[in-house]
């Protein structure tokens, strides 16, 4: 008798993606983050759905509705903090996933990589709009500052900003549309995830060595399902510890004050996961230049496959490239720190130096070192 999972039209697709999928035998824990991101997305959609049942997207009641969720709704507090800190977990996994792709040369699978960049932009847009919804001080001023950046676009900038705002300032219309898009985007992200996986399964997964592993494959289940479950347990432990012991650790205290258009907070800053891009934005004294640098800080990933000069795919056998990669990681951590500091000396100059280094490593040093290592291989 044939197995139903191999014959049923729907189960067959799941079987070929999750059970009988041939996977390289040498995958490390760095390959866990794809499944963790899928679980993060599911958690965010579920908690978000229940939060949306009690939230009101009106400037007069939005702040109070979030308070109501935390105080009066059964387990509303845990839903709210799972959703808020789940976003932080999402970005931790995202950045580690992208870092893994850079280190092991997974960007050579250009279709998968480009869909991944689209996903990154979509998740960032969703997180930004979600941060506006509680309608606290930082929500309001963050929305004002970031949307106002679009006014730097020549000719159409001002009209575009007013069109997004639905008026002459961030107000009721803005909040309502942000809620609508914040609700819609995760489902678009889920569809893009399917496309991401479709392209991945066309080529098969990369592995730490960067050497084709067609001769040494093992079934995804049980080997990698059990490995993914371990990763899931570690992530859930970290998330639940954060939610239950210090749920406001990563938030901004200013967001516990209702939005007041007449009172600007002393330091307007986004959530921690956007600070590196915010630091790059602030390090350029020109408004349009800053906006371009902000977009390019993520979009630069799209040209990484074109700049791959090395004869080896992975960095595992390339010590010079490894040094450069970890310098990039340190630089991003420095940018994250600078993004949270006030705009004053010495933070400004450190931010500018770190921004220049960020683009230099990716656009200049990585390709140069790759070429150099090719020559060293001939010796």
Swiss-Prot record:
Kindly state what the record says about how the cofactor is bound.
Binds 2 heme b groups non-covalently.
Q: Name one GO biological process term.
A: mitochondrial electron transport, ubiquinol to cytochrome c
Known cofactor(s) = heme b
Q: Where are the bilayer-spanning segments? A: 33-53, 77-98, 113-133, 178-198, 226-246, 288-308, 320-340, 347-367
Q: Which domain of life is it from?
A: Eukaryota
User: Which amino acids does the record list as binding heme b b566?
Assistant: 97, 196
One Pfam entry name: Cytochrome_B
Query: Which residues of this UniProt protein bind a ubiquinone?
Result: 201
Q: What is its main location?
A: mitochondrion
Q: How does it sit in the membrane?
A: Multi-pass membrane protein
User: Which GO molecular function terms does the record list?
Assistant: metal ion binding; ubiquinol-cytochrome-c reductase activity
* UniProt-listed PROSITE patterns: CYTB_CTER (PS51003), CYTB_NTER (PS51002)
Instruction: Please tell me whether the keyword Membrane is annotated for this protein.
Output: yes
Disulfide bridge partners, by residue number: none
Misc. comment:
Heme 1 (or BL or b562) is low-potential and absorbs at about 562 nm, and heme 2 (or BH or b566) is high-potential and absorbs at about 566 nm.
Similarity remark: Belongs to the cytochrome b family.
Function, as annotated, reads: Component of the ubiquinol-cytochrome c reductase complex (complex III or cytochrome b-c1 complex) that is part of the mitochondrial respiratory chain. The b-c1 complex mediates electron transfer from ubiquinol to cytochrome c. Contributes to the generation of a proton gradient across the mitochondrial membrane that is then used for ATP synthesis.
Oligomeric and partner information: The cytochrome bc1 complex contains 11 subunits: 3 respiratory subunits (MT-CYB, CYC1 and UQCRFS1), 2 core proteins (UQCRC1 and UQCRC2) and 6 low-molecular weight proteins (UQCRH/QCR6, UQCRB/QCR7, UQCRQ/QCR8, UQCR10/QCR9, UQCR11/QCR10 and a cleavage product of UQCRFS1). This cytochrome bc1 complex then forms a dimer.
Q: What is this protein called?
A: Cytochrome b
Protein species of origin: Micronycteris giovanniae (Big-eared bat)
Phylogenetic placement of the source organism:
Eukaryota, Metazoa, Chordata, Craniata, Vertebrata
């Amino acid at each position: 008798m044939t197995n139903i999972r191999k014959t049923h039209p729907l189960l067959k697709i799941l079987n070929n993606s999750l059970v009988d999928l041939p996977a390289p035998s040498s995958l490390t824990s760095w390959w866990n983050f794809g499944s963790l991101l899928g679980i993060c997305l599911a958690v965010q959609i579920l908690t978000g759905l229940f939060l949306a049942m009690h939230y009101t997207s009106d400037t007069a009641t939005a702040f109070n509705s979030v308070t109501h969720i935390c105080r009066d709704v059964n387990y509303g507090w845990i839903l709210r903090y799972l959703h808020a800190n789940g976003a932080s977990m999402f970005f931790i996994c995202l950045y580690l996933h992208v870092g893994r792709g850079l280190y092991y040369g997974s960007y050579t699978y250009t279709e998968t990589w480009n869909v991944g960049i689209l996903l990154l932009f979509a998740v960032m847009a969703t997180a930004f709009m979600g941060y506006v919804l509680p309608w606290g001080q930082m929500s309001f001023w963050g929305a004002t500052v970031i949307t106002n950046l679009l006014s730097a676009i020549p000719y159409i900038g001002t009209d575009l900003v007013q069109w997004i705002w639905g008026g002459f300032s961030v107000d009721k219309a803005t909040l309502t549309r942000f809620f609508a898009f914040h609700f819609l985007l995760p489902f678009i992200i889920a569809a893009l995830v399917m496309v991401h996986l479709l392209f991945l399964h066309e080529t098969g997964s990369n592995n730490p060595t960067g050497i084709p592993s067609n001769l040494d494959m093992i079934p995804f289940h049980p080997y990698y399902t059990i490995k993914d479950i371990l990763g899931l347990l570690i992530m859930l432990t970290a998330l639940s510890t954060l939610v239950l012991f210090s749920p406001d650790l990563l938030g901004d205290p200013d967001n516990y004050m209702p939005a007041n258009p007449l009172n600007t907070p002393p330091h307007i800053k986004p959530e921690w996961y956007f600070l590196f891009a915010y630091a790059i934005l602030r390090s350029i004294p020109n408004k349009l230049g800053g906006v371009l640098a902000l977009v390019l800080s993520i979009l630069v990933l799209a040209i990484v496959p074109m700049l791959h000069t090395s004869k080896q795919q992975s960095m595992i056998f390339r010590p010079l490239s490894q040094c450069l990669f970890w310098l990039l990681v340190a630089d991003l951590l420095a940018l994250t720190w600078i993004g949270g500091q006030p705009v004053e000396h010495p933070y400004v100059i450190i931010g500018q130096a770190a921004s220049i280094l960020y683009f230099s490593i990716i656009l200049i040093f990585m390709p140069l070192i790759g070429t150099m290592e090719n020559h060293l291989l001939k010796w």
